Amino acid sequence: MKTSIAIVDYGMGNLRSVAQALKKAEPAADVAIVDTPAAIRAADRVVLPGQGAMPDCMRSLGESGLQEAVIEASRTKPLLGVCVGEQMLFDWSAEGDTKGLGLLPGKVVRFELDGRLQDDGSRFKVPQMGWNRVRQSQPHPLWDGVPDDAYFYFVHSYYVTPDNPAHTVGETAYGAPFTSAVARDNLFATQFHPEKSAEVGLRLYRNFVHWKP
């Protein structure tokens, strides 16, 4: 029986790219972009993407009527948050003083890198855009087959700061180390974009399809 994966369509996120990457990572999976609570409830696994500003994402999710179904899914099935979809899982964001879903304790803060210089003498830029390494700070099934310190693709100005250090499973350095992947029970989320991260991103998506938390 095929594993069904619902990509939540609340009007914000790189949905087609995520769907294409999941299908490429595991052709046997039944991947669908969905916009109804019933479709989220019917799926075996859920992906919560997000891009842009967290206030816009939270408002759109609330207006879509899908928020309660996402919260319900977070309690009962594997759920993967991507980029702003990761940030939305937390309690609060400094971006627009925005309340999150409160599924993971912690907050979202902005890079404070004004005037800071990188090792090559150039200034740090915010947002961080481009490839950067992810150190696997804790083992996890979604890291299976993904080399430690592999490069993933980032586009963001804000990052999560979990209250519980045990929830951090990936760290990246940009001015200072920050949490770039989190996990707890059936939740996993990344600040980076697996769908833009070549083979290591596809491997992570494939691991999500087969993950049995």
Curated annotation (Swiss-Prot):
Organism superkingdom: Bacteria
InterPro entries cross-referenced by the UniProt entry: Class_I_gatase-like, GATASE, Imidazole-glycPsynth_HisH
Cross-referenced SUPFAM superfamilies: Class I glutamine amidotransferase-like
Location(s) in or outside the cell: Cytoplasm
Keywords per UniProt: Amino-acid biosynthesis, Cytoplasm, Glutamine amidotransferase, Histidine biosynthesis, Hydrolase, Lyase
Gene Ontology MF terms in the entry: glutaminase activity; imidazoleglycerol-phosphate synthase activity; lyase activity
Function: IGPS catalyzes the conversion of PRFAR and glutamine to IGP, AICAR and glutamate. The HisH subunit catalyzes the hydrolysis of glutamine to glutamate and ammonia as part of the synthesis of IGP and AICAR. The resulting ammonia molecule is channeled to the active site of HisF.
Protein name: Imidazole glycerol phosphate synthase subunit HisH
Lineage summary: Bacteria, Pseudomonadati, Pseudomonadota, Betaproteobacteria, Burkholderiales
